[in-house]
Amino acid sequence: MEEFQGYLELDRFRQHDFLYPLIFREYSYALAHGHGLNRYMLLENIGYDNKSSLLIVKRLITTMYHQNYLIISANDSKQNPFFGYNKNLHSKILSEGFAIIVEIPFYLRLISSLEGAEIVRFYNLRSIHSIFPFLEEKFPHLNYSADILIPYPAHLEILVQTLRYRVKDASYLHLLRFFLHEYSNCNSLIITNKSISIFSKSNPRFFLFLYNSYICEYESIFLFLRNQSSHLRLTSSGVLFERLCLYRKIEHFAEVFANDFPVIPCFLKDPFMHYVRYQGKSILASKDTPLLMNKWKSYLVNLWQCHFDVWSHAASIRINQLSKHSLDFLSYFSSVRRNPAVVRNQMLENSFLLNNAPNKLDTIVPIIPLIGSLAKAKFCNAVGHPISKLTRADLSDFEIINRFLHICRNLSHYYSGSSKKKNMYRIKYILRLSCVKTLARKHKSTARAFLKRVDSEFFQEFFTEEGGFISLIFPRASFALRRLYSGRVWYLDIIFINGLSNHE
C-alpha cells in the first residue's frame, strides 16, 4: 500500500481543531437560523492562517453574527421534553447549527487549498451548464454509457462514520450521533427514497451537508479507482470532478482499499472513461466494450454494499449504447448521432467531394415531461392544450403578463443549449395562450376577441431571444438571424434545474 500513498496527498485536521465548544455558543445557532453562512465570505478572506485554530473560528463566527443582529426567542408553550424547547422550531435551529459548525473546517481547508491557485473564485464553475461543453467534447467519441442512480444510506450510523474520517473531534461526533438519533425519532429526519429526493424542506442545509459528505466519500473512492485503472489521467475529467466536489481526498482511503479492494483488476484498464454527476444521478461513459461496463457495474454495486453497507441492485445502473439511447440528464435528452457533411476539396486542377459523418451530441428539450410539468402547474391540460390560470385572474394585467414572461424567460434561459428549438417554441406557445386565456377570463371575454382588441406587439416578448425574434409567428425573419440564434448557448449563471424542468 505504500505505492498508493503517493496518490492520497491529503490534508489532516490539526489536533487543536475542536468543534465541541462551539455547540454551546448561542450565536452559532442564531447565525444558522438567520441568513446562514455566506459561502463566499470565507473565500474572499484568503488571509486566514492555514493552521486554523479555534480562536480564528470563533472570531469568524462572532464577526458574521454581529452583521446579522439576530435574537432567538425560546418562549413557546409546545416544548420537547428532551430539548426543553419547541420541538419543530428549535430542532430545526439545532440541526442548522450542527451543519454550520461542522462546515467551518471544510471551508477553511478549501481556503488553504485555493491559496496560490490560478482560479480563486469559482462562481462560474458552479453552473450546471458547464457540464454540457464537457459532454459535447467527449461523448461523441464514446460508445457506451451507464446511467447510475446513487443509493442513499438509510442508517444514521453510516452518515456519522462518513463524517468521522473528516472531523477529528470525538466529542462533537458523539453529540452529533445522539442528536441525529433523537431528532430522527421525533421528526422522522431520515427518509428513504429511490430518487434520492430526501432533503427536508424545513432543514435543507443539514440534509445537504449530510448528503454531500456521503457523495464526497463515494466519489473520492471512485475517482481513486478510476485513476488507478488507467495509465493516462484525463485532465478534463479531473477538472470537472473538482468542480463538483471541492474537497480533497482523505487519508483513510489507504486503509479502505487495503481491506475492501486488495487488487484492482487488469480488465478495468481504460483510458477513455468519463464520469459526470448532478445530485443523485451520474453517468459513466466509455469507449470500450459492454463487458468492461458490466465489470464497472458490478464493482460499484459491491462498493456500495461492502463499504457503505447500502443495499443496491443491478437495476440502479443501466448500460446503454450512446448511438441508440438518449441520456436523461439535467432535464435534457442527450444522444449521440452522426452529422453527415459533404466537404469539397480541391488540389491543383482536380477537385473532389469528401463525405464526412462525424458524431455529434444532440441536446433536446424533453417535450412530454415538460408538458406534464406545465399540466401539473395548471398551464395546460394533459395533452398540452393551454388553459387559463385561475389563481392569477385577480391580478392586474401587468402582473399577469409579467409572471408569464418571467416563467417563459427562465425556461428559455435554461433550454438555451437545445440543438432543436421546435420543442421550446411549443412550450412558449402554451404559455402565451395560457396568458391570453387568463386575461380573457379576467375581462369576461373569449381569447379570440381579446387578441383582436390588443396590439399585435402585445405578446412579442414571449418569442424574444437575446438579439432577435425566432419564432413561428415571425416567418419573415432573416435567414442569417435564424441561423445565428438556432445554435446552442450554455450559460454560466445557472446553478440549479428550473422548477418546471425538474420532472424527475
UniProtKB/Swiss-Prot annotation:
GO terms for cellular component: chloroplast. Transmembrane segments: none annotated. GO terms for molecular function: RNA binding. The keyword DNA repair does not apply. Keywords: Chloroplast, mRNA processing, Plastid, RNA-binding, tRNA processing. InterPro entries: Domain_X (IPR024937), Maturase_MatK (IPR002866), Maturase_MatK_N (IPR024942). Coiled coil: none annotated. It is found in: Plastid, Chloroplast. GO terms for biological process: mRNA processing; RNA splicing; tRNA processing. The keyword Chloroplast applies. It comes from the Eukaryota. Usually encoded in the trnK tRNA gene intron. Probably assists in splicing its own and other chloroplast group II introns. HAMAP family: MatK (MF_01390). Belongs to the intron maturase 2 family. MatK subfamily. This is Maturase K. It comes from Quercus gemelliflora. The gene is matK.
